[in-house]
Design a protein with these regions (language model features):
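His/Asp/Glu-rich metal-coordinating catalytic cores
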Residues: 1-61, 67-227, 231-238, 242-246, ...
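C-terminal regulatory/interaction regions
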Residues: 11, 234, 238, 278-417
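Short connector loops at secondary-structure junctions
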Residues: 31-32, 185-188, 248-258, 366-375
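Short, acidic/turn-prone active-site loops that include or flank metal/cofactor-
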Residues: 32-33, 87-89, 156-157, 247-250, ...
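Short, charged/polar "capping" segments at the starts of alpha-helices
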Residues: 36, 88-93, 250-255, 342-346, ...
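Short, aromatic/basic amphipathic alpha-helical patches
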Residues: 94-102, 255-264, 347-356, 399-404
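Short acidic-hydrophobic, aromatic-tinged amphipathic segments that line or gate anion-handling sites
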Residues: 109-115, 271-275, 407-409
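Hard-cation-handling environments
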Residues: 192-331, 391
C-alpha cells in the first residue's frame, strides 16, 4: 500500500490523500484551501479519475463536511462512489439548498457508513471511528490492505461535547499501526491558547454575558457547529432566555435526526425568518419546510415586547432587518463565536460596519475544533505507530520533537507503507 498527500503537508485545510494498492486507488477528503479564490475548480488535484470516470479509482472517502475537506466534491465525476457518514449526507443535502451556487448532491453516487461498522471500498477495508470535532458526524479511519494498517485522524479534539470519544478510540484494537496521518492545526500553540478552552467553558462564559445583558443578544456562530448550538441553547436555559434561529438552522438541526438536540419545536427555541430568507422561501416554494418548522415562529413584534428574553443566532442575512429596527439595538450585545480570522475577511465587512455604526461591542467566546499539542502527543504515545506523517498543518517540523517515528512528507510525494 502506498499513499500520496496531494495537499495538506504545508497548510491547514484543503486535505486530499490518495491510497493505492493492488491496482486500485482510494481518495480521502477533497477540500478547498482556506485561502482559495473564487475559481474553485483550479484547486482540483491532478488525479486520474476525478474528472473522468476511472474504474481504478474505487471511491472517495469523506471524514467530515467542512469545506476544507469536502469543498471540491461538486467537481468530481458523478459516477465515482462517494462515502460519508449518514448524518453528514443528510446535513449536506439540507444545507446545499441555501448555497448561492446550488449543487444537487443527489446526482452523485452517494454511499453511507456508520460508526465502527467496517466496510470495503475495492481492496481497502475501512473502519470509521466517530470523533469529537466542531463538525457534526466527524470520523477518523482505520484502513487495512495488503496486511498493512493505516490510520487517518481527520480533524479532532477532546474539548467538545463528545470528548469521551478519544478515550473510546484508545480502547479499540488500534495497536500495530504501520502509518498514521495526524492533523496538526494548532500544534504550535501553547497551552494558554483557546485550543484548551472547552465547550463547557463557552457555555459558562455565555451565561455570564447573557445574564449581564439588558437587551437582545446576537451570537454569531456556525449553524453546522452543533456542539456550539447546544452550548448557546444551554446558556439560554440557564439565563432564562429563548434561542432564536432561522429556517436554515432549523433544517440543519432536523438533518441530525437527533431529538435530544434543540430542534425548532423544542421548548425555549423560536423561529425567526429574516427578509432575505422570506424571499428565498417564496422564490423556491419551500412552504412545506416553513410549515414544518413554524410551531414556535416569532416576529419582530414579539422580540420588541421583551428583547431581553431572546438570543438570536446571528448571520449576515439579518443585517437588512436590524438596520430597520434600530430600537432593538439599544442595550444589545454581539458575541462572536467563530475563528477570529474570519472576522477580518471581506465577508464580514458589512457586519463590522454595522457594529461600529451602532456602537455595539464585539465579545469573542470560542473554542477550537482541533487537538492541541498535548492531545496530539497523547494519541501518538497511545497508538505508537511505526510511521507518523503530519497533515493539515503549517508546522510539520514540530512533530519531530514528539516522536522519532515522524516522517515529514511533501505534497505529491508517494510513500510506501
Amino acid at each position: 500500500m502506498k499513499i500520496c498527500i496531494h495537499r495538506g503537508t504545508n497548510e491547514i485545510g484543503g486535505n486530499c490523500i490518495e491510497l493505492e494498492s493492488q491496482g486500485k486507488r482510494l481518495i480521502i477528503d477533497l477540500g478547498i484551501p482556506l485561502n482559495a479564490e473564487k475559481d474553485l475548480a483550479q484547486y482540483l488535484p491532478e488525479i486520474e479519475g476525478l474528472k473522468e470516470y476511472c474504474e481504478d479509482l474505487s471511491g472517495i472517502l469523506i471524514s467530515h463536511i467542512h469545506q476544507d475537506h469536502i469543498g471540491l466534491i461538486p467537481y468530481i465525476n458523478p459516477k465515482t462512489p462517494l462515502y460519508m457518514g449518514k448524518d453528514s449526507q443528510s446535513i449536506l443535502k439540507k444545507a446545499s439548498k441555501f448555497q448561492f451556487n446550488k449543487f444537487d448532491y443527489n446526482q452523485l453516487n452517494l454511499n453511507k457508513f456508520e460508526n465502527k461498522k467496517s466496510f470495503n471500498i475495492g481492496p481497502f477495508i475501512i473502519t470509521p471511528f466517530l470523533m469529537d470535532h466542531s463538525a457534526y458526524d466527524s470520523y477518523s479511519f482505520l484502513i487495512e490492505c495488503d496486511g498493512k494498517r493505516f490510520f487517518y485522524s481527520g480533524d479532532f479534539r477532546n474539548t467538545g461535547r463528545k470528548s469521551r470519544l478519544i478515550e473510546e478510540l484508545f480502547n479499540e484494537n488500534l495497536k500495530n499501526i504501520d502509518c498514521m496521518l495526524i492533523e496538526g492545526t494548532t500544534i504550535s500553540k501553547n497551552s494558554s491558547h483557546n485550543s484548551s478552552f472547552t465547550e463547557k467553558d463557552v457555555e459558562n462564559e455565555m451565561i455570564k454575558e447573557f445574564k449581564k445583558s439588558k437587551g437582545l443578544v446576537f451570537v454569531q456562530a456556525s449553524s453546522q457547529n452543533i456542539d456550539r448550538i447546544v452550548s448557546i441553547f444551554r446558556a439560554c436555559l440557564r439565563s432564562s432566555r429563548h434561542l432564536v434561529y432561522d429556517l436554515y438552522t432549523s433544517l440543519i438541526m432536523e438533518a441530525t435526526n437527533n431529538r435530544k438536540l434543540p430542534q425548532s419545536d423544542s421548548d425555549n427555541v423560536d423561529l425567526f425568518i429574516p427578509q432575505i430568507q422570506r424571499v428565498q422561501i417564496k422564490n423556491n416554494k419551500w412552504f412545506n419546510d416553513l410549515d414544518k418548522h413554524s410551531s414556535n415562529r416569532i416576529y419582530f413584534e414579539d422580540i420588541k415586547k421583551n428583547p431581553e428574553k431572546y438570543v438570536l443566532l446571528f448571520r449576515g442575512i439579518h443585517l437588512r432587518d436590524f438596520k430597520k429596527q434600530i430600537e432593538l439595538l439599544e442595550n444589545s450585545k454581539y458575541i462572536y463565536s467563530l475563528w477570529e480570522g474570519y472576522f477580518e475577511e471581506d465577508n464580514f465587512k458589512s457586519i463590522r460596519e454595522f457594529l461600529n455604526k451602532n456602537e455595539i461591542q464585539k465579545i469573542s467566546i470560542h473554542s477550537s475544533g482541533h487537538a492541541d499539542r498535548s492531545l496530539i502527543e497523547q494519541v501518538i504515545k497511545k497508538m505508537n505507530p511505526l510511521k507518523i506523517i503530519p497533515v493539515h498543518t503549517e508546522n510539520k517540523e514540530i512533530f519531530k520533537e514528539i516522536s522519532e517515528n515522524v516522517y515529514v512528507a511533501d505534497d505529491r510525494e508517494w510513500i510506501e507503507i
